[in-house]
Amino acid sequence: VAKSKQTTARKKMLEKLNVEEIRPSSRKYPGIIFSMEREPGNQILEVQDLKAVDTDGTVLFDKVNFNIEKGQKTVFLSRNPKAMTALFEIINGNRSAEAGTYNWGITITTAYLPLDNTAFFDSELNLVDWLSQYGPGNEVAMKGFLGRMLFKQEEVEKKVNVLSGGEKMRCMIARMQLQNANCLILDTPTNHLDLESIQAFNNNLVAFKGNIIFSSHDHEFIETVANRIIELTPNGTIDKLMNYDEYIHDEQIKAHRERMYS
């Protein structure tokens, strides 16, 4: 009897649905696929005794030592968000460290998504010409690439210096895909992205076979992508092979963090 009532209720519910409600979703997801041209070796990145200081004299981090191993997707955390940007700028050769060294493995190729992408868009180039700077391919191929990143046909002639924050971020992600790197460096990558773009980005990073070094404010993004956590402090690092939820709820780590920042 209960089953018969359920069936009747479901039938009534279906009858109430109009065509508007059962239309396919109009949400569009960009085609984000990172692929590696070269398989990485076992030595990815070694950092020794690295130190960075802000322009006002604040120590962002000090005594930073770590060795990134093959297959690791490492999120960097800090109470001072400038610490992660400083680290990423240093290992990309854009900034000098106050002390310490870093060495990339000889098989490693990197693609970097910086926090501030302003300098990339300071030109009168249209989207097709802009993207063509970063990879092989003719105009048709570049238009196809931009189409997968949800740029409409009429938008690809737009000048890059008038793009919105979200459009710039989609261009930067397209640029990274053309680089076919085996190590991705991402400084707060979900900034300016809509939910669909974040989901597409997230899914591809989970599937990516290379290494990822990143920072993010997005809890779900960190939880699903990272398999290693390194926290940068003025007194060294906290370095754990665990997921994000475990890390933030571990009482011993909480106590350790307080000591490291004091």
Which residue ranges define each predicted feature?
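Flexible nucleotide-interacting loop at or near the entrance of a catalytic core
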Residues: V1-D62
